[in-house]
């Protein structure tokens, strides 16, 4: 494998010319199919309309949507004009979206009507009341000075917002020469995507990724599984994470393969789509594969077309790995990394044993140096010696947006990114994650940062102290647990805490288990020992006869 210097838009043009009638995107459940040529034309129309809306190279386009067809359209349209797509988690509530819109300097926000109990329309009107009184194209928001447009992804009309249908019609009647001109100035090293990841400070940071970052990571991922133009990848993981928009999309676009999409995870839709489209590749976190295997209608579907896929996001039980191989005919691999590594650092291979794939994170990506260092001394660790996972290569982010201090904290002067994860390298060259220097919780593939939840809970006046940890869960990898001590004379119930969280922070961040304690285990220097809180939580649940789910 050699590295490529293409851009997202350039690769799309390549396949639209080389394989114009080859399917790029399929939504089996809504009978929607777009060839590379058709998709490229749609992208060009949206890109032209974005230029007309005043977007320039480097401007930020926010997208707050589940896996709807035009999610990918906006990604490629933004890329073609040199803009940066800022992905927004579909579970985010008002305060989280507000922070990202402001911090990212979003120029144009693209959104659907909502997701689950989350009404995006109400939230956006609440944040930007000017939408109801000002003309489209003349938005002047007091709260978001950089914001100039809001686009509704759909055909319904909302005051102050454009619709995708309107943008497509605009683009159809526009001269394409300005688009060609600006596209020719886009470099593979330009920023194309920005995703927010929380830090130990509790403040989310914008991870800036380039075309070069994500396309080479996607290409390597596809090569691990021997992708060709004949492959059909069923994607049910969210596009707003690197798993979806890099490991899936960029693996497809670098190999001329086909994306078979599901808007949001539903095991029945996944199985039906695999059956109908004869999908060859399937991605998911372990809980998704378990839900598919356990579905009562599983045996009604023919999934023998599957040959490989990725199971990532949290630790995979070896029993699940073996069932996926035997019952789904899917020789899955796993990928380890961070958003900051685009996200690939290491991966298992299809030739590895099920045990290796279930218990290790494999070997380094091509052209990526991986090493383990002693976090105290900075010296390289020997085989079998635990230390911090670090890497250097094309996969390293361009940095955190408007945060050079945090960038310098994670990328050292030699260009190595420090993951904060503890690991060991075995005698076969495979890496195994053994813990975290950071206290990040991974629940069902979602990264959760305790400090963010702790900061939010401290707003409850009854709380004196709160610490959030992850408790090992057989289903989700980890569950969120909160340990709370109350101020003298105050009372608070578990239900009070959950009610306070509900609707204000993303559902997956809400503590599943809440413990009220009088004092916290401390070190001699006065630091709280979170590992002892984890042990205490397990003891209290066992004593109460509660099994962690």
Descriptions of predicted regions:
Residues 33-37, 183-185, 189-216:
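Conserved AMP-binding A3 loop
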Residues 92-102, 109-111, 282, 393, ...:
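AMP-binding/adenylate-forming catalytic core of the ANL superfamily
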Residues 11-35, 157-158:
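AMP-dependent adenylate-forming
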Residues 52-53, 81-169, 490:
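Structural core segment of the AMP-binding/adenylate-forming
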Residues 215-232, 240-281, 289-291, 295-297:
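Conserved AMP-binding/adenylation subdomain of ANL enzymes
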Residues 168-169, 276-284, 293-356, 369:
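Gly/Ser/Thr-rich phosphate-binding loop
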Residues 2-4, 24-76, 93-98, 166-172, ...:
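Conserved AMP-binding/adenylate-forming core of the ANL superfamily
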Residues 20-23, 143-147, 151-158, 162-196, ...:
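Conserved pre-ATP/AMP-binding loop-to-beta segment of ANL
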